[in-house]
């Protein structure tokens, strides 16, 4: 009996499944942990209803609710999402960007930044503008603020090696691409937070240009902690300071092809607000 060959479509599905599985198995530690926290937080939003605990109201970034006792919201709102659709879209958008960042800068640096200035600075910018300029109180949640922050950093790095792209006879600066995506996202998803995305993007530009890199922990301190705790030996998928693939925040630009890698994912971020 003649051997049967797998149809081309079936082979493509198998190949894509294998590539996806291989990619997921190579995700670094902090990226895995962040995705897991997002998923578990979504589960909590469902389970919490039976406990009379509204996770969204508890952890969303609500400008008028920010005070000394509720500063935790600055760190919780990126992990909380409006619904399963919102959760999946932000995971798909955020994972490749975060994975790239962690491989470039290390796990410990990623933890320090995403639980530090990458959350607090755009969050406080949003709260300040909402409360004192717009006199509004629109709650926001979701990881899309981080998506645009990382896209801003990628855009600046791309600009250093490829300053323009051409449409017809016009030269468009490459750094403007995420800004256009913020506008497009706001137009296609009216419930998304234009201000939240813009705050994240501005912080990403600041880090990409090097103005905010002083907020990153010094490498000598990271090496001291890694050595004392033997993090590389104890934690699987950990990326040490000496394993990172690039320099610190734009000091060593990547190639044009790699710098463009994060951009295609931006259109699916869809950060959303609580309520209408």
Curated annotation (Swiss-Prot):
Q: Which residues form the active site?
A: 144 (nucleophile), 197
Return the InterPro entries for the record. Answer: Peptidase_S54_rhomboid_dom, Rhomboid-like_sf
Q: Single GO cellular component annotation?
A: Golgi membrane
- Keywords (A to Z) from UniProt: Golgi apparatus, Hydrolase, Membrane, Protease, Serine protease, Transmembrane, Transmembrane helix
Pfam families listed in its UniProt record: Rhomboid
Name one process (GO BP) from the record. proteolysis
E.C. numbers: 3.4.21.105
Q: Which residues form the signal peptide?
A: none
Q: Does the keyword Cytoplasm apply?
A: no
| Chief location bin | Golgi
What topology does it adopt in the membrane? Multi-pass membrane protein
Query: Which is one GO molecular function term here?
Result: serine-type endopeptidase activity
As for subcellular location, the record says: Golgi apparatus membrane; Golgi apparatus, cis-Golgi network membrane
Q: Does the keyword Protease apply?
A: yes
Tell me what reaction this enzyme catalyses.
Cleaves type-1 transmembrane domains using a catalytic dyad composed of serine and histidine that are contributed by different transmembrane domains
EC class (word): hydrolase
Q: Which residues cross the membrane?
A: 27-47, 77-97, 109-129, 132-152, 175-195, 198-218
Q: Which protein family is named in the record? A: Belongs to the peptidase S54 family.
Task performed by this protein:
Probable rhomboid-type serine protease that catalyzes intramembrane proteolysis.
Q: Return the protein name.
A: Rhomboid-type serine protease 2
